[in-house]
């Protein structure tokens, strides 16, 4: 049984909006990273859902690539968060103003 594409798009839209709200409203770097990951998962869900709907495997392959890129992104971002926590003592983004002119 294939889930209708409209339902897949609705769920993906809700996930994307939830991730976007998390990114925009949170000041903690880890919570922002979780929001970005939720948004990436929503995009992957759209790719897999559309791929199943049109019975074409390209969307699933791109979703697999997206998962690999997301894993690399999480690894780098968490390394940066650990570095910032050790060097500055906080992960609140309001405290990072070193680039201001």
Swiss-Prot record:
InterPro entries: NADH_UbQ_OxRdtase_chain4L/K, NUOK/Mnh_C1-like
Domain of life, source organism: Bacteria
Keywords in alphabetical order: Cell inner membrane, Cell membrane, Membrane, NAD, Quinone, Translocase, Transmembrane, Transmembrane helix, Transport, Ubiquinone
UniProt membrane topology term: Multi-pass membrane protein
Gene3D superfamilies xref list: 1.10.287.3510
Catalytic activity: a quinone + NADH + 5 H(+)(in) = a quinol + NAD(+) + 4 H(+)(out)
Enzyme Commission identifier(s): 7.1.1.-
Keyword Protein transport: no
Record has Cell membrane as a keyword: yes
Compartment list: Cell inner membrane
Protein name: NADH-quinone oxidoreductase subunit K
Protein species of origin: Syntrophotalea carbinolica (strain DSM 2380 / NBRC 103641 / GraBd1) (Pelobacter carbinolicus)
């Amino acid at each position: 049984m294939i889930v209708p594409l409209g339902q897949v798009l609705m769920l993906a839209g809700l996930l994307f909006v939830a991730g976007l709200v998390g990114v925009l409203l949170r000041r903690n770097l880890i919570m922002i990273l979780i929001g970005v990951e939720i948004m990436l998962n929503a995009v992957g869900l759209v790719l897999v859902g559309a791929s199943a709907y049109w019975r074409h495997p390209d969307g699933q392959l791109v979703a697999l690539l997206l998962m690999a890129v997301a894993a690399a992104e999480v690894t780098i971002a968490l390394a940066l968060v650990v570095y910032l926590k050790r060097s500055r003592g906080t992960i609140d983004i309001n405290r990072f103003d070193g680039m201001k002119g």
